[in-house]
Regions:
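Catalytic cores of carbohydrate-active enzymes across secretory and cytosolic contexts
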Residues: 1-246
Length: 246
């Protein structure tokens, strides 16, 4: 920061947090913010995009079912589990980094099971991603989710997050789950590309999300705990807030 002429965060919140972290140091450059973006031409499904432009709910619903069929073929081929395109489908898919809290929704497992087994309001959940080879904490997290959900027919873990798989997950999901520790996600662009494909963000208001979010209109925001609380307590509170929303 002392050697540079300028620096920027990759979302407005990231810029704000970075200034709080570094502005007490003498001789550093100005820290601004330039929010990351994604290429709509690459990520959006053309037929779905046309339906969204026309505000044609029937066409949107029909195309989403077609895209879910494609995603669920991938899921079936890898896991053997058969998902229903008529059921609300939640996807958590990204790097298995600890701060992203892939297992937050499972924290109160008994309450999670009640939601997962609710026949009146059924859901399906897909986790996808890869931990780094020697990140044993992330590997344990991945394994924990697998073992906790392996006997649930409507929950599964898919290995990988290559571009083609990422595209299927965003196009075939109904809800895109994003629950990092607050102030830890610099930007996080997966929710942008999910939104391009009529997948609603269910998210902590971190990274780029506060610049986009209108709770109950274009997304659902998970209420965050007080900043002053210990992280373990924050995790418990935010897990309950997530389950409340579901």
């Amino acid at each position: 920061l002392r050697m540079a002429k300028r620096a920027n965060g990759v979302s407005q919140l990231h810029g704000e947090v970075s200034r709080k972290m570094w502005n007490s140091y003498d001789g550093i450059c100005e820290i601004t913010a330039i929010t990351n973006a994604q290429n709509k031409t690459y990520w959006s499904d053309p037929a779905l995009d046309e339906a969204l432009k026309r505000d044609d709910n029937n066409a949107i619903s029909q195309r989403k079912k077609e895209l879910k069929h494609k995603l669920f073929r991938v899921v079936a081929n890898q896991t053997g589990k058969l998902f229903d395109p008529n059921v609300l489908t939640i996807v958590w898919a990204r790097r298995f980094a600890a701060y992203k809290r892939a297992n937050l929704i499972l924290s109160d497992f008994n309450r999670f099971l009640k939601i997962a087994r609710n026949k009146k309001h059924p859901i399906q959940i897909i986790w996808a991603g890869k931990p780094y080879p020697e990140d044993f904490g992330a590997i344990n997290l991945f394994n924990e989710i697998f073992w906790k959900t392996k006997d649930l027919p409507n929950c599964t873990v898919v290995t990988g997050y290559e571009l083609w798989l990422s595209g299927h997950l965003k196009k075939g999901s109904d809800l895109w789950l994003n629950n990092p520790k607050l102030y830890h996600e610099a930007s996080g662009t997966s929710g942008m590309t999910a939104a391009m494909n009529a997948s609603i963000n269910l998210s902590i208001p971190d990274g780029w999300v506060p610049e986009f979010s209108k709770h109950g209109k274009n997304c659902f925001l998970i209420k965050t705990a007080e900043d002053s609380l210990p992280q373990e307590e924050k995790d418990k509170i935010e897990a309950q807030n997530l389950l409340d929303l579901l």
